[in-house]
């Protein structure tokens, strides 16, 4: 459940929220109102995280309302869509994300929501859709991001083991991250 991201990130940031960064690999902006699995990014901004140091990789254009897309833009959040990831590659997307999220040299938290992956890769993720990134790209992103000294925390979210396929591919992917 992606609602863990809020508490996990705050724990990583400690007293350094003003210089902190956030990188999400997620199909959704997570900018909903309230306290839910669709609101951790908004709640972190409300807590004081600078939205200009937030980078969202893998945003799916058809899984987000135009209101959330406009909100992300107006807040100054850097969005690298699935289409852009396909064009520039996951390595370049991660490099750009680290530069932006780490601009103030504060701690970075990474949120890996597996709904960023193609539905065929993560059948145990109810929000996954066709057209997402591959398991290899998600693993590559996790390795690239966590090799940076500013990345101090990472969460893996949205795996419902009771819904996985017979070969347990989602669970195995989560374990390999």
Per-range role (PLM):
Residues 1-177:
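Conserved alpha-helical scaffold segments that buttress catalytic/binding sites
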């Amino acid at each position: 459940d992606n609602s863990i991201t809020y508490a996990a990130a705050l724990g990583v940031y400690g007293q350094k929220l003003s210089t902190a960064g956030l990188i999400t690999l997620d199909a959704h902006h997570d900018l909903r109102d309230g306290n839910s699995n669709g609101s951790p990014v908004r709640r972190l901004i409300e807590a004081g995280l600078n939205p200009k140091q937030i980078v969202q990789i893998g945003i799916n254009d058809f899984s987000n309302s135009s209101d959330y897309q406009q909100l992300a833009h107006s807040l100054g959040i850097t969005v690298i869509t699935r289409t852009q990831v396909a064009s520039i590659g996951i390595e370049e997307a991660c490099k750009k994300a680290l530069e932006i999220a780490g601009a103030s040299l504060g701690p970075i938290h990474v949120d890996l929501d597996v709904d960023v992956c193609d539905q065929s890769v993560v059948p145990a993720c109810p929000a996954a859709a066709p057209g997402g990134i591959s398991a290899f790209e998600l693993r590559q992103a996790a390795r690239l991001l966590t090799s940076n000294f500013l990345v101090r925390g990472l969460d893996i979210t949205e795996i419902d083991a009771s819904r996985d396929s017979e070969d347990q591919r989602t669970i195995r992917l989560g374990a390999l991250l």
